[in-house]
Amino acid sequence: MFLEKVGNHKRCNMLYDPSHYVLQNLDYLAHIDIYHEKIKMFHVKDAELNPSGKQGVYGGFQSWVNRAGRFRSLGDGQVDFKSIFSKFTSYGYDGWAVLEWECCLKHPEDGAREGAEFIKNHIINTTEKAFDDFAGSGADIEANKKML
């Protein structure tokens, strides 16, 4: 839709923020599968959506603490960051992963300290070779007979 309107211009890219997808009840993992080539930056930000009989996605008249949808510190919300970082790694993502923090409960200094460590612990160091690379190297029949 939007890409069509801009003629799929090469400079039209995306800042991926899974917290907003949680609050919209969108599949943020499938979004990576669809748009991974356009994602150039990633806001590492958590959120939770806990709808009730009185409020859902749109609970804007409540304080942030009492809203059904609210931002949380990394790891305290509903975003599956292990899956996100795994998907980005599998697609060869080499863009920025930036902490964005707006928790309605936790102190900002705690959020920043914990957030930096959280991101560091989720970054995947990509392997240089597959676990079964040895399989294509051929077999030493005589050595195998000797071992057996």
Predicted regions and their residues:
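C-terminal helical cap(s) of enzyme catalytic domains, especially alpha/beta-barrels
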Residues: 108-129
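Residues at the N-termini of beta-strands
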Residues: 41, 95-96
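A short, acidic, flexible beta-alpha connecting loop/helix-capping segment that sits on the rim
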Residues: 99-107, 136
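Terminal-tail/helix-coil boundary detector
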Residues: 125-148
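A structural motif corresponding to the C-terminal end of an alpha-helix
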Residues: 6-9, 83-94, 126
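Acidic/histidine-rich catalytic cores of soluble enzymes
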Residues: 1-78, 130-131
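A structural alpha-helix within SAM-dependent methyltransferase catalytic domains
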Residues: 3-4, 36, 85-89, 116, ...
